[in-house]
């Protein structure tokens, strides 16, 4: 394994991955804040943790080093001055309603041991947890019935989205929604102050502070020359253009392929409808088999992004991009339309490839799993009755840091 960030494919043997073990943040979910916190349901924490632990153990059993958001963020904040700076930035990004509240929350959190503090900001800070303080703020009075000073971050177990390791660099994302934007701040501090992310030649392709939204579920590293990006509900054209300019101008990658996908929650990211499982095999949702519009981005001689539009079938596109004589598309749910919709909702297309032809999937997507098995793909199925309630699969729940080259 090469040191540091090294990720030039979707299918090379996975050596190291960043996860977040689902925690008390999901206990902050109630029906009235579903829209605010981007959930449709409430996972049962005890079972969700068991399922997530089973996921991590499958990875370890297959030679993957598993590291966690809480631990890696705590390493980055070991210096008390950096910890204090982070807290001030995090609290500001949380939009507390008054200076008095912000100061009280800062002192409450800053006194905690660092690892405990990181876990606490993820799970959320309730108003009744912070020592009382005097405030004559009208905004504070009006919002007094809302239970949190700092909202929980229940989406963080989908570690794919806040950032992506691409080649020998990191893309730290400006998330589409304010609810999730703070997640990438943790990754920003990892990059700046944790040597496992900041050391050596690790570069930065996009940053938390950039203005336009992009999320990691829309980024697929097809090979050492080509990165695919979804133009989706969560990723904008302006962000893709800036990302492409930075990546293509400072790396070995030669092109960015942009897939224009439906702007709906069911097709939230590119990896919910399309993932790579082997050199020439892909899981897909049937609705993207029809001719697609995509854009190919490259740099011109002046270092500016030029793009061309292509309309073709996914099969032809992948054959051309990957220089393959043929590719095989494995439909989520097979030819059964109801199974396809059901298993798409439960992320049947969202597989995590940990080696060529070996994938981690949810066991509940049995139709798709059987099809993968028949096509010669080794399926490592994990329980997902509770963790799937967040609308993300094994790929969503993982941020690969290091893979073997293929």
What is the predicted role of each segment?
Residues 1-406:
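The feature marks the mature, well-folded catalytic cores of soluble enzymes
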